Amino acid sequence: MADGLNMSRRIRRTPYTDRVEALGVRGFSVVNHMLLPKAFETSVEEDYWHLRAYVQLWDVSCQRQVEISGPDAGALVQLMTPRNISKAQVGQCLYVPIIDDQAGLINDPVLLKLAEDRFWLSIADSDLLLYAKGLALGRGLNAYIHEPDVFPLSVQGPQAEALLAEVFGPDIRDIGFFKFGWIEVEGTQQLIARSGYSRQGGFEIYVQGAAHGPGLWDLLWRAGQAYNIRPGCPNLIERIEGGLFSYGNEMTLQNNPFEIYKKSVKQLMNSNAINKNKKET
């Protein structure tokens, strides 16, 4: 329960908090000033085996979006990351480590390309929005940067695709890995990506508008009973086993991309710093 926390703009509930509390959440963490469920009635080990066999519904609203749009949106995103985004297609997701002037990792979001001049950065636990605003101002870039009203809901596990295909139709199966499409929820179009913080397969639904969140949760929960659905959260055993690091835990500002990732990175705003780190790593 979140009874021991004083809710404010610094610690925010989500559209799904009432649902996870009713389902027996045993604790929360705070990520990006928002509640993240951390444990339910089952043990971490039992949760691990369930996730590998069935399907779970996760409240990951704490994955806040930093929206960058405008004529210089692409240039600003490229300025922040060593990942070359020039060939990214609309409808594609990219993992894009964000670095500072010394090649230290500031964040490791997933980039969603909504249009040629509009991007979402689905962030880990640091204030990337402020960094983006500072760079845009300092470089004189024409870009609008803000946090949209988006609350991701994750459906993870080997039964996730079957559940979502039953609810939203077979076209769900055509969405490729790290690609996204659109589904109808309560008369609105909502973005759904084949992605998530597990290695068991699944999707993330980026719910635009908090009012649509509870209804979507209830819809998936009812349909999920046939698939042995449970509430869940990122599982420590499963994500480490799958090589999914957590910013703030396994990597921080003190690390550079060459210490964390196997593949090379190129075309950096701070190429001198990266090259220095490459030689030392």
Label every PLM stretch briefly.
Residues 1-96, 104, 232, 261:
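Acidic, proline/glycine-enriched N-terminal capping motif
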Residues 44-53, 98-108, 137-140, 184-192:
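Short amphipathic beta-strand starts and helix->beta connectors
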Residues 71-107, 160-188:
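Internal amphipathic helical hairpin motif
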